[in-house]
UniProtKB/Swiss-Prot annotation:
Binds 1 zinc ion per subunit. This is Methionine synthase. The lineage of its organism: Archaea, Thermoproteota, Thermoprotei, Sulfolobales, Sulfolobaceae. Belongs to the archaeal MetE family. It comes from the Archaea.
Length: 332
């Protein structure tokens, strides 16, 4: 990793696919363009996403997860033991290809190495982050038709993910984020769910980040310091920063990734609003352990709005950096 400034800015993972990529995917499904043409479109989209992140001033970018349709489906398609029967309705007219576990979970081959290697080759920084969905969330959002209990399934999946993460490190990944938005869904699962995440990152030599977003933070707060990761990032903006008090109460002692951008609202935060929110966070945590990010992935927004939100996030962060510099902090 290269040296980062005080209050590094990053994204959670996903970013809106360019319209022309969505059209290329449609044409490929219709058999009108080749696999090679689709891969070229994916590669071009990664370059476009990284350009947006660069122009916005993001310190730690991602490839936007543009090759992935969904955060669970992508991995279930590539790990032995899963099967898809068809889409299920999530709400209204929204459908999701929910996977089912029908046999023992086994790691087959690298899933993310090729996409990381390409993103690394075109990235403007070696502080490139790669994301992977965690074992608990994949299981929670799947059907179990094989294992006698959920815990055994999660731990088998954690072992498979551990192999993938180690392959990413071997390919040069320095910052790896495990996405566990479902970890705090069920209070009774949290303690062993944390153990499963630790199994997934066992023996990994990289900067490890975990993402937690919407849900009941009070379920997971007592266990956060047990996670074998360097940083945990949270959705805060949507909760008006109320979880800060909870984390402080439980003595949260890791790096904190603070969500300051509401990804479900098309309103674009101003840079001064972001700066005020960061000042609020600094009442609870020191700047040396604070990173700045959106609440969650940006993929559901338009590309224009997502980009403008990132610009506000970065500009607001710069305002606070300058204030800290005047107080004697080293910010570069």
């Amino acid at each position: 990793m290269s040296k980062l400034p005080l209050l590094p800015t990053t994204v959670i993972g996903s970013y809106p696919r360019p319209k022309w990529l969505r059209e290329s995917i449609r044409l490929h499904k219709a058999g009108k363009i080749s696999d090679e043409d689709l891969q070229e479109a994916f590669n071009d989209a990664v370059i476009a996403v990284l350009k947006d992140h660069y122009n916005a001033g993001v310190d730690v970018p991602t490839d936007g997860e543009v090759r992935r349709d969904e955060m669970v489906e992508f991995f279930a398609e590539r790990i032995k033991g899963f099967k898809f029967y068809g889409p299920v309705r999530v709400w209204g007219t929204a459908y999701y290809r929910k996977p089912s576990v029908v046999s023992k979970i086994e790691y087959k081959k690298p899933m993310l190495v090729d996409e990381f290697t390409f993103a690394k080759s075109v990235s403007y920084t070696d502080n490139l982050k790669i994301t992977i969905t965690g074992p608990y969330t994949i299981v929670e959002w799947s059907y179990n038709e094989y294992y006698k209990n959920k815990k055994d399934l999660v731990f088998d999946l954690a072992k498979a993910i551990n192999q993938e993460i180690k392959n990413l490190v071997e390919a040069g990944a320095k910052i790896i984020q495990i996405d566990e938005p479902a970890l705090h869904t069920r209070r009774e699962d949290v303690s062993w769910g944390v153990e499963a995440v630790n199994e997934a990152v066992k023996g990994v030599n990289a900067k490890l980040v975990m993402h937690i977003c919407y849900g009941e933070y009070s379920f997971v707060a007592p266990y956060l310091n047990e996670l074998k990761v360097d940083q945990i990032n949270f959705a805060f903006k949507i909760y008006n920063y109320k979880p800060l008090e909870l984390l402080k109460r439980y003595g949260f002692d890791k790096e904190l990734g603070a969500g300051v951008i509401d990804v479900h609202n098309r309103r674009i935060e101003t840079s001064e609003e972001v700066a005020n929110d960061i000042r609020k966070i600094l009442e609870y945590f020191t700047p040396e352990k604070l990173w700045i990010n959106p609440d969650c992935g940006l993929k559901l927004l338009s590309r224009k709005i997502a980009y403008q939100k990132l610009v506000s996030m970065v500009e607001g962060t710069k305002v606070v950096r300058e204030e800290l510099k005047r107080k004697g902090y080293s910010v570069d």
